[in-house]
Structures are given as C-alpha cells and as structure tokens.
Regions:
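Carbohydrate-binding surface patches
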Residues: 498-501, 506, 542-598, 637, ...
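Carbohydrate-recognition beta-sandwich/jelly-roll modules
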Residues: 29-251, 287, 369
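Bacterial N-terminal signal peptides
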Residues: 10-20
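Aromatic-lined carbohydrate-binding/catalytic grooves of carbohydrate-active enzymes
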Residues: 217, 221, 225-355, 359, ...
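Solvent-exposed beta-hairpin/edge-strand motifs
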Residues: 63-65, 120-131, 595-611, 687-701
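Bacterial Sec-dependent signal peptides at the C-terminal "C-region" and cleavage site
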Residues: 19-29
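C-terminal beta-strand-rich structural cap/linker in extracellular carbohydrate-active enzymes
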Residues: 620-654, 710-740
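Glycan-recognition surfaces
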Residues: 312-339, 343-348, 398-516, 541-547, ...
C-alpha cells in the first residue's frame, strides 16, 4: 500500500489554518501595571492574574441581572483598558480598568455580575479585615466560606485580596480548594490587592509564614502555676501519673517543667538541684516518656551558672555580660542569682556552651518541647551595657537571631520551640514554632491589684494576638486553669476560647484534685485542631505597638461578644459559636444569622454543646440567658429533610472523633465510624425529622441506650469497649418511614 505524501504547500497551508484557528480562540492578553487578563474567545471566559500572587480568578463568565449568560463577545484593547461588548441575549458593555493594585469593572447593565472560580487552598485563606469587625471573632477549621467573608489572604506573599462587599464567595462543590466567586456590579465593582498586609498594614516588621514543622498547636501541662519555684521531683511524678491516667487519652501530650530546677550554687540546666530532684533531669525525662508522654523544659538560654557551668569546669570570663561596674547580672526568671547572663556577642558561647548543652537535652535526654525564655530582658540588658560586651559592634537583635538560629539548628525540626519573655514580636518568625504573646496569668478571674495577674491577662493575649495564630506561629496566651476560685462557668469560657481559636493549650491545674465536672472541661476541648483565624487584625486593640512596631502583651478595649468557628469537616458545614457574657451578673445575649454570615432565608439547628441540649431552630435571631462570666456554646447547622448528626460527646468541634459519616436514603440508614476513648462512653446527638422513626441501632460494641425527644433530638450512647483488633467504633442507626 502506498502512503500519500503531503506537498510542502499543503503542509504550510495546514499549519497556517491551525495557527489562524488558535489565534481566533486565544486573544492577546490585556497586561498593565502587573495585571494580566486573558480572554478565551471560543469559551468566552476570562482569566485574571497578577504578578504578586499569580492566578486570581479563572473561567470568569458574564451574566445579566436576570441570570442569563452574556455571549457573542467583541473585544477591544487599549494600553490601560479592556472592553468587552456582548450582543446576545442582551447588548452590554463591560470595561476593565487597572490602576496600581486595583481592578475596576464597570458594566452598562446595572445588576449584572461576574462569576468564576478563585484558588483558595491552605495557603490562600478566607479573611476579614478590621473595617468588617462586628464584635464577633471568626475562625475557621477546614475549607470554609460564608456570606460575610469577602476577602482571601495569600499567606506566602503577604497579600490581601479584597473583593467588593457585595461579592459572594462559596466553596466549589467539585473542588473545595477553590471558591466560586460572584461579583455583582451596580454598575461597578472593584477587586483590590493589599501587598505586604501584615508587614505594612498591621506593622508586623518581620512577617514570615509559619514553617510547617507542626500541624497543630501543642497540648500539655506546665508546672509553673501549680508549684512555681518550689517544684520537686515528687511533684512531677505525681502530676505525670495523673496526666497519663486522666488526660493523655484525650490528647494531652507534653509535661513541661518550668523554672525552679537551677536553684542552688551547684545547679545548672544539666545538673539539677539535688535536694529537689535527687535523680536528676535525665531520669525525670525517662519517667515522663515511660508514661507515654513527652518531656518539655523551660530554659533561659541566655544564662548559665557562673560557678558551675553546664559544659566545662569553668567558662572564660568573656563568656559573661557585665554592667559598667563590672558586675554580673542574674538571668531573668531563674531560681536565684547563680544563673547569670551570657555574652553572646562572643561566638564561642554558642559553640562551647549553647550547642553542646542543647544537644545533650535533645539527643541524650529526649527533649521534645523547649520553652525558650529570657531573650526580651537579655536584649534590654545588652543594649544598656553594650560597651562592656565582647564585640560591641553587634546589635542585640542581630545577636538574638544568631542565638535562635543555633537553637533551631541544634534541636532540629522535631522539637517544638516556644518563645517566652518576649518584647518585640517577630524577630524569630521562622525559627520559633510558637510564642507567648502576653504576660503571666493566674487562677482568678479578676486581678487583685491594678495590672496584676489574672485570667483577664489570658483573654487580652488570646484575643489581641489571635490574628497571628497559625499564620506566623502558634500563639501562646499563657496557661489554661479552671480550679477554684474560678467557677465552672468561668472554666467553660476559658476552655471554649482556647479550643475555638486553636492556640497553644498548656494547662496548669492539679488534675487529680479537680472535680470530675471541671476535668471534663479539659477532656472535651483537647486536643487542639488546625484552626486558622478569619479575622486578620488585632481585635479592638487598645495597645500593641511601640514606635510603630508590634510589641508583646496586647491590650484590647473590650472582649468579643462571641467566637464563631466555621467548620468544614466529616459532618459537613456548620458553626460552633461561643456566646459570651462578660458581665458580673446573668445577662441575655443575642445573635442573628446575618451577623454570622449565614443565610437568613434558611433555617438552622441549634445544639447546646455543654448542656447536651437541643435548642430548636432559628431562621433569624436567637437570645439566651447566660450566667455571669459564662459561655453558651452552640453547634449551628442548616436544617435538611433527613437525619443529621449535630454533635458528638467527645469534642467541642465534633471533628476529633468522627472519621466517616454517611446517610443512605435508600436504606434509611445513618452510619459512620468514630474514634473513642477507652473507658469513656461515646454519644451521638442526631436530629431526625418527624416522618422517620428509629428501628434499630447497630455497632461493633454495646449500645448502652438510645433516647428520643419530642423535639426530634436522638441521643445514642455506646460503650468504648471495642472488640479485639478493632481500631474504631462502627455504628448504624436505621430508620423507617411513618405517617404524620
């Protein structure tokens, strides 16, 4: 068989036709001042990009006010403007004009809209800015969207993408890492970029995205607010035993010894006070690990015992900082003045003291959590006595960063480093995994004197710095405590706040002495989850800067009315709302669906998490009487015409235990799998419509009971004693139709 040969002319003609066809479909893009708008003439769609962030919007379509797609485009390009004329089914003119970091869109058909998709993955997150503040702090868990969220923040580039206030961003059903964006024009709309948002708008001088060494903030126990400087080995054994028994099954991991162990002339960070810790630090670390927990330690890395240093018989005199009179200075927060400040302008201090000491703590002792203290006051002292330093040409901030670089390099990426005793925020973004953001708190609600310690300090830090959490590091507002004289209601407010913001969760209570009711506050809020802030600004800040630079210990003007955690998880989309009463007497508190960014044209279930009570539904507002300093936590979920899981008994977010969930409309079965805590019962709280009735509950463990209420609430309680080899609880709730 002969193969027909194409002539050169035929081949050239074919290529020309192909090129003409491609050219007719692909319009030359409009490019101006960093913006790029590409037009696909065949599909009649737009793609919008910017040099700062790459792709902004794609597959953009034009729609008329009556929801008809506008087609038959005619394109006109000038140096600074793109114009699209549509001819079917309506004539209209659309202009796209860019000026610096703004894209302005105008249409001749008021009420028309643009519809497309925007990248919105883990690195480009839903956001709100300060002008949108309504007294509620919004946070997110999973790929969420809401009617009151009109911006996306691009974490890697520190760029805020602000759509118009009438824009509606909803998750794409086929790809939850994208947003469907609807931009209404009346007759104009603007898309704005705010570059260097944290750096310039918020004044965060050293902005750097949080390295992904850890996915969630740590959960643990700290000795300080139980025993302070008097902590002993016996105390640590007793608390470790209690933590392993009572809270380890619920997610607590770290047992952290705080300052105390270096007191005495012979004690240092490696050779502890023998009276208080007769078997030493390495033995205690091994004991903690033997209980399935992880050892953590407070260390002022800017100090060392002068008489008996850690890594030599005697350090050279030029290892230490001195004042103008030649005196040594006690390091911050250590047990006594035997630990003095080191002179890190001398590089030998890092090589011969810091690195060897930390290497022993990690590689020989098994350190996994470092509370890295003392640097704020060290910098102050260095600046005051710089002339006496080994190398006075070095500034305190330069030295500080060098020290922390050495700490990170020595400890590696598997040790959580939590900065402590900070001043200026951000010098060690990228090196710290987390940091304290404020002063010390105390297990009382109000301070006993002006500027005294109390849980008010905790709340100022938590709300004033939440915009940093899981963006640049994990924020540590200081420890959580619920013991007396704090009331049960105050304890609910404290644990609900930390759990719904996802900040570092370090408790400091005598766990084996807590009443069961208060212990349950910890159990139902541990572990932490990878929550991100939606509100990317310091909440109603009174003071958080010095000389224009963000400083520690933020003070807010007032605490928020509520925290609204928006969740996208196994159980679908829902809100976990903590509604606060900060008053000293019982008071009514309210919210509306519109305030939460929910659809006021729909109806929503309300489930009271702490009281395990169904509060009915709302399509507008809800009001409740809340006790003084108390919190009402509601799970809010859109009503559907089939059985819905509202909550579990395990965790305030309902995300920790639930692994799978499915409703089968053919067999009328709600089924799923859950992770349960051995020795603890596990409940599902389900709403069912009135036309369905439970016929059977099946599980791979004992079903303790199921109860139904007239309002539609169904509770099913299971034993946690699973069969040998079973990793999860598997369950089926089977219904049948009934006439109503």
């Amino acid at each position: 068989m002969k193969i027909k040969q194409f002539s050169g002319f035929t081949l050239i003609l074919t290529l020309m036709i192909t090129l003409m066809f491609v050219s007719s479909c692909t319009q030359k893009p409009f490019e101006h001042e960093g913006w790029k708008i590409s037009v696909d003439s065949e599909k009649e769609t737009l793609k919008i990009e910017h040099e700062l962030i790459g792709l902004l919007l794609k597959d953009m379509l034009l729609f008329s006010p009556d929801n008809q797609r506008l087609s038959d485009w005619k394109i006109n390009l000038t140096a600074s403007k793109l114009t699209i004329t549509t001819n079917s089914p309506q004539e209209s003119t659309w202009t796209f004009l860019v000026t610096n970091n703004k894209l302005q869109v105008h249409t001749s058909l008021a009420g028309s809209y643009l519809l497309g998709t925007a990248p919105a993955d883990e690195e480009r997150i839903p956001a709100r800015t300060e002008e949108e503040d309504n007294g509620i702090v919004f946070t997110s868990l999973g790929f969420i969207s809401a009617r009151n969220i009109h911006s996306l923040f691009d974490i890697p580039t520190d760029t805020m993408i602000k759509f118009s206030s009438q824009a509606i961003l909803t998750r794409n059903e086929e790809n939850i890492r994208q947003m469907d964006v609807k931009i209404k024009l009346d007759p104009e709309a603007t898309v704005s970029l705010v570059p260097d948002y944290y750096l310039n708008v918020l004044g965060l001088k050293y902005y750097q995205p949080r390295p992904k060494r850890f996915s969630t903030a740590p959960v643990g126990w700290c000795s300080w607010y139980c025993y302070y400087m008097g902590t002993t080995e016996e105390d640590m054994i007793r608390e470790t035993d209690a933590l392993a028994r009572l809270l380890k099954p619920y997610g607590l991991e770290i047992v952290q010894l705080d300052a105390c162990y270096t007191r005495g002339e012979e004690a240092n960070y490696l050779e502890w006070n023998k009276e208080a810790f007769p078997r030493g630090g390495k033995w205690l670390f091994e004991y903690i690990r033997s209980k399935g927990l992880k050892p953590g330690l407070w260390v002022n890395v800017y100090g060392s015992n002068y008489a008996k240093p850690e890594c030599a018989e005697k350090y050279p005199e030029n290892f230490y900082l001195r004042d103008k009179e030649g005196n040594l200075s006690g390091a911050c927060c250590t047990a006594d003045k035997t630990v003095v400040r080191l002179d890190y302008s001398n590089p030998e201090v890092i090589e011969k003291h810091l690195k060897p000491m930390l290497s022993i703590l990690k590689n020989e002792w098994g350190l996994v959590y470092l509370k890295d203290a003392g640097w704020g006051t060290w910098m102050d002292y260095y600046d005051q006595n710089r002339e006496q330093a080994f190398d006075s040409s070095k500034g305190s901030r330069e030295i500080y960063v060098e020290v922390q670089q050495a700490v990170r390099k020595t400890l590696g990426d598997d040790v959580f480093i939590n900065g402590c005793a900070m001043h200026e925020v951000g010098l060690c973004f990228g090196l710290f995994d987390g940091s304290r953001t404020g002063g010390d708190d105390k297990a009382i609600w109000y301070p006993q004197k002006e500027r005294g310690m109390s849980m008010q300090t905790f709340f100022h830090s938590l709300f004033g710095a939440n915009y940093l959490n899981n963006i640049v590091w994990f924020c540590d507002p200081d420890v959580v405590m619920v013991r007396n004289p704090l009331t049960y209601e105050e304890g609910q407010t404290i644990v609900s706040s930390i759990a719904l913001t996802g900040q570092t969760y370090m408790a400091s209570d005598f766990m084996d002495k807590l009443p069961t009711r208060k212990l349950e506050l910890y159990r139902k809020t541990m572990p932490t989850t990878p929550i991100k802030p939606v509100d990317l600004y310091p909440f109603r800040i009174l003071k958080n800067k010095r000389n224009g630079v963000v400083w520690c210990c933020p003070q807010v003007k007032e605490f928020p009315r509520a925290i609204d955690l928006k969740v996208n998880g196994v159980a679908g989309d829902y809100d976990v709302l903590a509604l606060f009463n900060w008053k000293d007497e019982a008071a009514e508190q309210s919210f509306s669906l519109e305030e939460l960014g929910l659809d006021p044209e729909k109806e929503y279930h309300l489930f009271n998490f702490w009281e395990e009570k169904y509060e009915g539904t709302t399509s507008n507002t809800f009001t409740a009487l809340i006790p003084p300093h108390g919190t009402l936590v509601l799970i809010i979920k859109e009503v559907k015409p089939y059985p819905q899981l509202l909550s579990t008994s395990r965790h305030i977010t309902s995300t920790i235990s639930l692994n799978k969930l499915n409703w089968n409309p053919d067999s009328l079965t709600l089924n799923g799998t859950s992770s349960v805590v051995s020795g603890d019962t596990y409940s599902l709280f389900i709403w069912k419509p009135s036309n369905l009735q439970v016929t059977k509950v099946e599980a791979n463990t004992e079903v303790l009971f199921h109860r139904e209420e007239e309002n539609g609430l169904l509770e099913v309680k299971f034993s946690s004693n699973l069969p040998e080899g079973a990793a999860h609880l598997t369950w089926n709730v089977i219904f049948k139709s009934v006439n109503k």
